Amino acid sequence: MIKLCVFDFDSTLMDGETIDILAKAYDKEKEVVDITHRAMAGELDFFESLQERVSFLKGMPYDLVLKIGQDLPLMNGAYELIEFLNSKNIFVVIFSGGFHEGIDPAMKKLKVNLGFANYLHHKNNTLSGLVGGEMMFSNSKGLMLQRLKNFLNLQTHEVMCVGDGAND
């Protein structure tokens, strides 16, 4: 019986890639989108590509990031799926190579139990172009899943994972 369901966020629960949406709002879409596609296909190192993509956001107003994070489009059926899993007492978690600025509002809307992601560094309401957090490497999700399984005392057959990219 499934007791834990872990979802990726970008292009899985959310319809699109947060970094691409932020880049478009900051007129840096062209610079970021190709890197995102290549990283998700496993052609680029996830950590290096994340750093490079975030560097293009340097100078972006942080309050704009937060507003965009509030309005990210969720996939059709996301609410119903999470509601169903919650009704079965399945612990629902988001593992995102994206950002808390995007997943945190969605977690509240969807009633997700827990989320792990990265943070966009900022000072004086301006992005620094740097990123940090628990999901910065290609193996971060696997390591966090193992920790979570141990913490919840679960076996592999009690866990379901849903994702779309090379780091999922």
Features from the language model and the residues they span:
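Substrate-recognition "cap/lid" segment bordering the active-site pocket of phosphatases
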Residues: P105-V159
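Acidic, divalent-metal-coordinating active-site segment for phosphoryl/phosphodiester hydrolysis
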Residues: E101-I103, G163-D168
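A generic local structural motif
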Residues: A78-E80, Q146-L148, A166
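Short, hydrophobic beta-strand segments that form beta-sheet elements in well-ordered domains
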Residues: I94, M160-G163
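Alpha-helical substrate-recognition element adjacent to the catalytic core
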Residues: M1-Y119
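A cross-family signal for key residues in well-ordered alpha-helices
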Residues: D20, Q146, G163
